[in-house]
Amino acid sequence: MKATTQLRELLKGDDIIITPGVYDCLTARLAETVGFSAVKLLGNVTCGSLLGLPDLGLIGLNEMANHAKNVAAAVDIPVMVDADTGYSGGPLGIARTIKEFGRAGVAGIGMEDQVTPKKCALIPGGTPVVPIKEQVRKLQAAVEAREDPDFVISARTDAESVNGLDDALNRIKAYEEAGVDMVGVAMSWVRKEGMRQRTLDALQRIRDAVKVPLNCMFMDEAIQVGNVTLDEIKQLGFKMGGSNAVRYTVVKAVTEMLTILKNEGSTKNYSHRLASLKEYEALVRLPEFLEMEMRYSA
């Protein structure tokens, strides 16, 4: 089954699709190995891992599409891609973006309505957005440009951080009418403590605003800081939710290991936390390739 069709089938199911935010083939393989049904290739950490740069619109379409192609080929589960603002200021460029990602073999993309150059929505200070009509034209071009009807197009609005939730709700309604398959609202205030009721109320209003499947943006943050539960998010009818924890885990764990290596000259005192060579070889499917080599060399 095509990755696009797999994702469509998942969206028809009763459960929420939790998509860990991966950044390369290995993290995608790890997610698949432990049983996730789909992953999200994040722009933020891909920009950091490929270029060593922050998420400020510094990665381009070709870099992201080429990287996405490798990640999609490395796993047998659907890969959604964070396509930022679409890497173009107009509908013609957006159409090319959709075609490039479609040819890369990913299951779908998410596009946000920030101005260009964009910045990560988790950066304090708000994220300016383009006018609704401009974003609607982009999304209409995206929907029209897909060559595979199962290719999923998700639209996210960042308007809440600058214009409030009412404008964000108006936007996702307009994006739904433009023909996208899923919508989400980035909520800036989930970083604040004691926001449980406000978070729940906002999630309910988002659910009531549209009929298409909903992506719970920054779900980990909503649970940890907004103090809502995964069950509550499920009960509200959200179909997808992401986690940014992969990148934070890697930064923390690798820093700890490197510090021990630098200070002690070996990783002996960290070895209990290291994967074995056999585990790594299984992750990259070495036994499978060796068996294939044996068959063809016989």
Name the predicted role of every residue range.
Residues 1-216, 224-241, 289-298:
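Alpha/beta enzyme core
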Residues 7, 244-298:
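Extended, intrinsically disordered, low-complexity segments
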